[in-house]
């Protein structure tokens, strides 16, 4: 078993890390203050190729494997999560459905402009009464004439205020179906824009469909297959989100070690106090363990597997582990860690907290894992 990255993958990883450290983390206080991603930062992400991670090369993207995308997302986790979420939704769950299940006309219309950032994508699944229970969604799409009429209400939709279109899920006569809904379609509007504790700049809001008319060609794949498509998008999305958690945990660990080497108490550096040294060791162990599980999930997806249990395991371990690691880092910084905008730890703490909630809460991940075990998905097949 060889864990060595290829030269190309190391270059990819380093280019994203350099972008995050030089552009993302250098201006994070401004993002926190304005709750806006600077245009130059989005353009920088485009120039590195981050807006086209999932888009095939023939449409102007990078066409990366899931493992390669996971490398990128781990590096994104080192920076502001508002930027990471913007990129993740645009080129991840807001894009993968079109890439994998869209027809040739849909790909030709949307993907080239998504790769350049001219059009920003979003993913509209969550509703006020159906978050983790996505299959309980109430938005309906009624077939009328040569198209559909949508009625419903989506919430917590990342990128919605800036989106050109939404990969949207609604009930049809055949079951839950997926559609590409342009934001300027008649009857589509943006509702409340949320003021979030972390993820500053990501723009999260409600999306309202009131007799919204869309053409028949907006349907992705077949009617009634929407949840199958959503699950595939979410398995990959949970894997790359888990990678961001690992990246955040790694960044917190590095900051904590640096601080513990410099800060002195009782005549010696913090890191020489055994209690603090053990805490740092635990932070490192959690991060390394989660990283292995995350990349295992990514590898399974690249082999054509569904990775349902594996992606949920990665999400659960990475989110919970990174949260504990970031909280431990804040504890090491003491009072300075709780001062907003001082040492970056407070931003990591606020950004990371929601990872235990969205894309399926930690409780839901345990339900998914247990459900797979009941179905006989017990063995860890390395072959």
Each PLM stretch: what is its role?
Residues 1-83, 89, 101-106, 113-118, ...:
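Alpha-helical interface subdomain recognition
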Residues 49, 72-77, 170-173, 181-186, ...:
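Short Ser/Thr-interspersed hydrophobic loop/turn segments at strand-loop and sheet-helix junctions
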Residues 64-65, 133-135, 159-163, 200-202, ...:
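Short glycine/proline-enriched turns and hinge-like loops at secondary-structure junctions
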Residues 114, 129-132, 156-159, 171, ...:
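Short Gly/Pro-enriched turn/cap motifs at secondary-structure boundaries
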Residues 117-125:
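A short, Trp-centered hydrophobic/proline-enriched beta-strand micro-motif
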Residues 136, 184-215:
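Flexible, small-/acidic-enriched active-site or ligand-binding loops
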Residues 147, 151-193:
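A short core secondary-structure module
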Residues 210-229:
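Long, acidic (Asp/Glu-rich), low-complexity accessory segments flanking structured domains
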């Amino acid at each position: 078993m060889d864990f060595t990255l290829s030269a190309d993958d190391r270059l990819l990883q380093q280019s994203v890390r350099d972008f995050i450290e030089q552009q993302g983390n250098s201006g994070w206080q401004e993002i926190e203050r304005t709750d806006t991603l600077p245009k130059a930062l989005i353009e920088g992400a485009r120039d590195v190729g981050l807006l086209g991670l999932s888009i095939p090369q023939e449409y102007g993207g990078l066409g990366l494997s899931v493992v390669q995308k996971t490398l990128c997302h781990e590096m994104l986790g080192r920076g502001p999560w508002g930027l990471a979420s913007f990129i993740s939704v645009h080129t991840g769950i807001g894009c993968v459905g079109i890439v994998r299940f869209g027809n040739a006309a849909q790909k030709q219309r949307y993907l080239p402009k998504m790769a350049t950032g001219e059009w920003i994508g979003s993913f509209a699944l969550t509703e006020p009464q159906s978050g983790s229970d996505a299959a309980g969604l109430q938005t309906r799409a009624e077939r009328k004439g040569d198209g559909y009429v949508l009625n419903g209400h989506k919430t917590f939709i990342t990128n919605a205020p800036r989106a050109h279109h939404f990969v949207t899920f609604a009930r049809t006569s055949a079951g839950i179906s997926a559609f590409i809904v342009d934001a300027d379609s008649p009857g589509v509007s943006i509702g409340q824009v949320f003021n979030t504790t972390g993820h500053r700049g990501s723009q999260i809001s409600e999306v309202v469909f009131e007799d919204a008319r869309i053409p028949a060609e907006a349907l992705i794949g077949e009617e009634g297959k929407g949840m199958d498509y959503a699950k595939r998008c979410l398995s990959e999305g949970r894997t790359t989100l888990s990678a961001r958690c690992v990246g955040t945990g790694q960044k917190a660990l590095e900051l904590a070690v640096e601080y513990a080497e410099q800060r002195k108490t009782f005549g010696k550096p913090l890191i020489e106090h055994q209690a603090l040294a053990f805490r740092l060791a635990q932070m490192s162990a959690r991060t390394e363990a989660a990283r292995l599980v995350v990349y295992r999930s990514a590898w399974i997806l690249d082999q054509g597997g569904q990775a349902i249990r594996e992606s949920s395991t990665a999400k659960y371990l990475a989110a919970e582990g990174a949260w504990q690691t970031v909280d431990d880092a804040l504890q090491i910084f003491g009072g300075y860690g709780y001062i907003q905008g001082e040492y970056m730890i407070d931003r990591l703490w606020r950004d990371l907290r929601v990872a235990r909630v969205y894309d399926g809460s930690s409780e839901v991940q345990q339900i998914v894992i247990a459900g797979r075990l009941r179905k006989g998905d017990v063995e860890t097949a390395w072959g």
